[in-house]
Amino acid sequence: IEHWSDSHAAELHSRLDAARSNSEGLISAKDVTWLPPLTRPGKICGVAMNNSASNDRKIKAPDHPAFFLKPNSCLIGHGADLTVRSYYGSVHPEPELAVVIGGRIRDAEPEEVMSQVFGYTIFNDVTGNGMRAQDMFQYYALYPKKDNPDEVERVEQHLSYAARYKGTDCFGVLGPWITTADAIASPDELAVQCFIGEEKIADDNTSFYNYKVAEVLSFLSYFQTLSAGDVVSMGTAFKPGATRKSIHHANFLKVGGPVSIEIEGLGRQENPVIIEERELGRWRLS
C-alpha cells in the first residue's frame, strides 16, 4: 500500500483485463475464501458517535471527533462465521465506512490528508452492548483544582472501557475488498444499508456523519501518526430501514443472521452468525 502508484494501478487493470479474457481461469466469487483485505493493520481507529442521528441522545459531548482502538485480532473477512458466545450478552452490528491509509499522516490539515488515502472498504464494527454495561464505572475522578493546582477535586464521572465490547474476536468484519480512492468521487456522500436476513435495519448515508473523512483524519493526526495500512472507521450509519427497526434491535442472540452491509461503490459484505452456547470459563485463581 505504501508504495502504490498510478503505474501499479494501470498494471493491475491490465492483468484483470487479461484474466477476464481467459474464461477458463475464472473462479466464482462463491468458491473463494475471503480473508480481510488487510489482515494485520497497524491500528484500527473507530470514531465514536459520529452520526448526526445520535446527536439528540447526547447529554454532554466533545466538539471534536472521539476515538477508540480495536485490535487486529478481532478481524474476520466477508463470508466468515461471525461467532458470538452466549456469555457476551447483547451484540449488534454497526455498518461503517472504513478508510484505508496509504501513507504517513502527521500534523496534517484537512486539505492535505486525502492524498494519503489509499482506498475505502466496508467495516462491520460489531459491538457488545452487554459487555459495555458490565464494564461501566461510576466513580470520582481526581483533577487538580483550577484555583489551586496543589490540591485535587473529585468529579463524578461515568465511563466504560471499549476493549471487550469493541475488541472481542470476530467483532470486526472488513471487506470484501478495498476500492481505491480514485474510484470514489466523494466518500462523504455514500449510501449505506444493513440487513439481517432480508430485513433492512439501516438505510443511511455518510453525508450524515458529523465529521467528514478529511476532518477526522486531520484531527487524529495531531495525536496519533497514521501509517500505510492503518484503518479508520468513520462511525455507524444507523438510520432505521423501512420497518423502523434499527441496528439496536438486532441482538444477534435473538435475531441470528446472516448480517450483510452494502455501501455504494464498495460492494456487499455478508456473514453468517454462529451462536455458541457456553459459559465463561474459570479465570480467577483458586
State what each model feature region is.
Residues 1-66, 88, 258, 262, ...:
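N-terminal non-catalytic cap/leader segment that marks the start of a structured domain
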Residues 1-30, 135-136, 144-158, 227-239:
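A short, charged
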Residues 36-37, 43, 89-91, 218, ...:
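Residue "hotspots" at secondary-structure boundaries inside conserved domains
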Residues 41-208, 212-216, 278-286:
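Glycine-enriched loop-and-adjacent helix/strand subsegments that border the catalytic/binding cleft
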Residues 95, 176, 238-286:
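Charged, cofactor-coupling segments
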Residues 196-198, 235, 264:
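Short strand-turn-strand beta-turns centered on an Asx-Gly dipeptide
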Residues 212-254:
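A conserved acidic, glycine/proline-rich C-terminal tail/linker
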